[in-house]
Amino acid sequence: MGIIAGIIKFIKGLIEKFTGK
């Protein structure tokens, strides 16, 4: 759960970086 949650958080961060210009 910890690793998966970390990956999801990381991907969400990248998406916000690209979408929240």
Curated annotation (Swiss-Prot):
Keyword set includes Cytoplasm: no
Record GO biological process: killing of cells of another organism
Signal peptide: none
Tagged with keyword Nucleus: no
Keywords noted in UniProt: Cytolysis, Formylation, Virulence
Modified residues (N-formylmethionine): M1
Family annotation (Pfam families): PSMalpha
InterPro entries: PSM_alpha
Inducing factors: Up-regulated by agr.
Other notes: Peptide production is higher in most prevalent community-associated MRSA strains than in hospital-associated MRSA strains.
Function of the protein: Peptide which can recruit, activate and subsequently lyse human neutrophils, thus eliminating the main cellular defense against infection. Stimulates the secretion of the chemotactic factor interleukin-8 (IL-8). The ensuing activation process triggers an inflammatory response in the host, thus contributing greatly to virulence. Also possesses hemolytic activity, which may contribute to the development of disease.
Record family assignment: Belongs to the phenol-soluble modulin alpha peptides family.
Protein name: Phenol-soluble modulin alpha 2 peptide
Gene source species: Staphylococcus aureus (strain MW2)
